[in-house]
Amino acid sequence: LEEDESAAASTMAVSASLMPPIWDKTIPYDGESFHLEYMDLDEFLLENGIPASPTHLAQNLLLPVAELEGKESASSSTASPPSSSTAVFQPSETVSSTESSLEKERETPSPIDPNCVEVDVNFNPDPADLVLSSVPGGELFNPRKHKFAEEDLKPQPMIKKAKKVFVPDEQKDEKYWTRRKKNNVAAKRSRDARRLKENQITIRAAFLEKENTALRTEVAD
């Protein structure tokens, strides 16, 4: 125990003998010429008689602050995991694309003209019937595309013939015969127009019956 105490006392004496040379050095300060300089730690320890014990910490003390910060930033960047090159999944992009697709689905298609739609119907009317249903000197009646006015499809009242008025032969003058001819022409024209319309409606109805049957069969299938 006495040997340990004497060794500690001798060590403290050596340290005490080393202190004055370190702190006796004064740094002149006049406000302008004062500046800090970096010094090699080994030279500093050797100059003051202190045995050098090089460690990782002592080596860092020799480096300027800027270099230390550079090393720290480099080490932190090296330690950080590399950024993935895969594109980041953005939920907002998915939502916007979904909304745009839904809007496209909701868009109503352009209306189709029913007159342009043709149904495959096996309908071949008699050419003679088509002639009877056509206006003389006009185009041949087409039961597939012909359209009637609303007035044409209304039920027509029954026309009663007027009672015949007996006219004596001595009263049948030129004026009488002229009026009678006009009435006969008008009556014939009315009968022909009525018969033409009836023929057209009949053939058109026959075609619509065929078309209706074909559509019902297609829907059922």
From Swiss-Prot:
The record's listing under PROSITE patterns reads: BZIP
- InterPro entries recorded for this chain? bZIP, bZIP_sf, PAR_bZIP
A Pfam match is bZIP_2
- Keywords assigned: Activator, Biological rhythms, DNA-binding, Nucleus, Transcription, Transcription regulation
Q: Quote the Gene3D superfamilies the UniProt record gives.
A: 1.20.5.170
Identify the coding gene: TEF
bZIP domain segment(s): 173-221
- For whether the record's keyword set contains Cell membrane, the answer is no
- Leucine-zipper: annotated segments: 196-203
Q: Where's it found, cell-wise? A: Nucleus
Segments for region (Disordered): 72-116
GO annotations of cellular component type? nucleus
Q: By what name is this protein known?
A: Thyrotroph embryonic factor
MF-aspect GO terms:
DNA-binding transcription factor activity, RNA polymerase II-specific; RNA polymerase II cis-regulatory region sequence-specific DNA binding
Q: Which PANTHER family match?
A: THYROTROPH EMBRYONIC FACTOR, THYROTROPH EMBRYONIC FACTOR RELATED
Q: Outline the inducing conditions.
A: Accumulates according to a robust circadian rhythm.
* Ranges for region Basic motif: 175-195
* The protein's assembly and partners: Binds DNA as a homodimer or a heterodimer. Can form a heterodimer with DBP.
A GO BP term here is: rhythmic process
Primary localisation category: nucleus
Family stated for the protein in its record: Belongs to the bZIP family. PAR subfamily.
What job does the chain carry out?
Answer: Transcription factor that binds to and transactivates the TSHB promoter. Binds to a minimal DNA-binding sequence 5'-[TC][AG][AG]TTA[TC][AG]-3'.
